[in-house]
Amino acid sequence: MSKLYDLVSDYAPSGDQPTAIKQLTEGLDAGLAHQTLLGVTGSGKTFTLANVIAQAQRPAILLAPNKTLAAQLYGEMKAFFPNNAVEYFVSYYDYYQPEAYVPTTDTFIEKDSSVNAHIEQMRLSATKALLERKDAIIVASVSAIYGLGDPEAYLQMMLHIRRGDVMDQRDILRRLAELQYSRNDIAFERGQFRVRGEVIDVFPAESDQDAVRIEMFDDEIDCISVFDPLTGVVKQRDLPRFTIYPKTHYVTPRERILQAIENIKQELRERQTYLRDNNKLLEEQRISQRTQFDIEMMNELGFCSGIENYSRYLSGRAEGEPPPTLFDYLPHDGLLIIDESHVTVPQIGAMYKGDRSRKETLVEYGFRLPSALDNRPLKFEEFEALAPQTIFVSATPGNYELEKSAGEIADQVVRPTGLLDPVLEVRPVATQVDDLLSEIRIRAVKDERVLVTTLTKRMAEDLTEYLHEHDVKVRYLHSDIDTVERVEIIRDLRLGEFDVLVGINLLREGLDMPEVSLVAILDADKEGFLRSERSLIQTIGRAARNLHGKAILYADSITKSMKKAMDETERRREKQQAYNEKMGIQPQALKRNIKDIMELGDITKSRKQKVSKTVPLSKVAEPSLSYNVLTPQQLEKEITKLEAQMYKHAQDLEFELAAQKRDEIEKLRQQFIANS
């Protein structure tokens, strides 16, 4: 049998990787429903998973706990499988405010959102890959458990064109309009088509760089070509057939829309009667007005704002049935891999109840019909029923994963680089600040970095101020810092712009920082979720990528959580040391290009686009920019122009450039105030 996956890597599996790959692959072949990969920080878990997928020869969904880790995972998988369909499926909202009603203040908040067009294209590309190819790897966030269009309706709506078919040009254009493509003969963009004589050009919604040209000879399809929409260069000519996918996952055949409208009218009548009987006349008037407007829009245009609230009728599902999700697109032999499962699994369980609470208020006060409650994420038990064979991946698996795996745990403790887990020390709380200061000075001389984790925001602020007064280059990472700036701060730490990063819940799961040689955990003996066994192991793991990694736990007594975390770290060190001695391995420092890590998740950039080496890395604090003295009118114009550029960069996920523009705008605003 020919291999589906082409795994490209300069390295062969080493350390614990071969054993883990063999165990997981054999488990899949034996039909095990759940397995766990217990992989420590820096042990090459992603490479192990890539090998498992390649050997299993099956499509897979990889779930990550957030967009940052999903982007990192996507970048790594893309590098391992350049010739396969590695796709990215996360929420396409740059900004999302769901509709909500606050009864206490009688405030209705309209739904407001900003959709990232590029991520929308990648989502469509992901479902297309699952429908068309066996070698699909989809890296997704928890967005995968939210309602998506019904796969049956989606497949039914696809437009198949074949060379030699007899089709009236108007029929093709009508079908494209049904797929929600719009005609634009001037600006040709994704999700649009244009007509020039007997030639129809279509820019498929799921494509980022290819468009299709349909050439007609009277009513016959004479030629089908694929071309570059920017240059017009034909890439493939005389294709025998081509399939055009709908512009959105929420398309529905006309007959089903008409049937859905009848069902909505019936439910509206029942709801009106109920509200009148309970003397809720304002709510009855609200629901009538809103629903009738939606019905009119669906009749005329085939869709309406908030059409997902009628998904029960549009998908033909019964009340209470689970909504269609990404898992409905996954073939029956697919795999599910849950990364950082100790975080991701609880996330999946939490989504349903939060969504339900908000919608029940909307239904009660007449803003939505009760059927809107079926537009929801999956319940946890529904997710369990839908999930195919699953591999949980974590350095600290939760009780749920361990229970489900029933002893089927692949231990990946030995790192290919030979690096050991950090050396642990427990020191008294009384002198923790002064002791920490002396440790920081030792690291600063060696050009190494330090992470310090505290229990409270106040303590983190006071400690940062104290260290700053003692001439330590320190920054404080807190909850008010947005994702963009957080990434910049991490990069600046790695570049040596400062030596110490203080925080509360410091990146227990996240990006690699090989420069960090010391992790200091203050008040480690205060039991709680920030000092639980798993939290401590994850925090200690931040120093595991450094040759001289060390973790200091400041405590007056050793708690159960500390004891378990210390025992587990010691177990790992002993196993790693024994392997190194047996194989004659000398631990090697991990060198990872800083720019590579920061660009790993920049998925919106063209694969061909290269970043110039002369472009300086932007920093959290740029040197002061000089501006000529401008009039208030000129300043206003300049601010408007920069804001447009900032939003464009943010839409394209070019967060560093967006932050740069934001800082420029702030300086101009201050200048504007001073001049006014």
From Swiss-Prot:
Motif Beta-hairpin per UniProt: ranges: 92-115
GO MF assignments: ATP binding; ATP hydrolysis activity; DNA binding; excinuclease ABC activity
CC per GO annotation: cytoplasm; excinuclease repair complex
Keyword hit for ATP-binding: yes
Binding sites annotated in the UniProt record for ATP: 39-46
Subcellular localization, as worded in the UniProt entry: Cytoplasm
Keywords carried by this UniProt record: ATP-binding, Cytoplasm, DNA damage, DNA excision, DNA repair, Excision nuclease, Nucleotide-binding, SOS response
Domain UVR: 636-671
Family matches, as CDD domains: DEXHc_UvrB (cd17916), SF2_C_UvrB (cd18790)
A GO BP entry: nucleotide-excision repair
Pfam families in alphabetical order: Helicase_C, ResIII, UVR, UvrB, UvrB_inter
Highest taxon, organism lineage: Bacteria
Domain Helicase ATP-binding: 26-414
Family: Belongs to the UvrB family.
Record text about domains: The beta-hairpin motif is involved in DNA binding.
Subunit-structure text: Forms a heterotetramer with UvrA during the search for lesions. Interacts with UvrC in an incision complex.
Alphabetized PANTHER family for the sequence: UVRABC SYSTEM PROTEIN B
Function: The UvrABC repair system catalyzes the recognition and processing of DNA lesions. A damage recognition complex composed of 2 UvrA and 2 UvrB subunits scans DNA for abnormalities. Upon binding of the UvrA(2)B(2) complex to a putative damaged site, the DNA wraps around one UvrB monomer. DNA wrap is dependent on ATP binding by UvrB and probably causes local melting of the DNA helix, facilitating insertion of UvrB beta-hairpin between the DNA strands. Then UvrB probes one DNA strand for the presence of a lesion.
Protein name (database record): UvrABC system protein B
Lineage, uppermost ranks: Bacteria, Pseudomonadati, Pseudomonadota, Gammaproteobacteria, Vibrionales
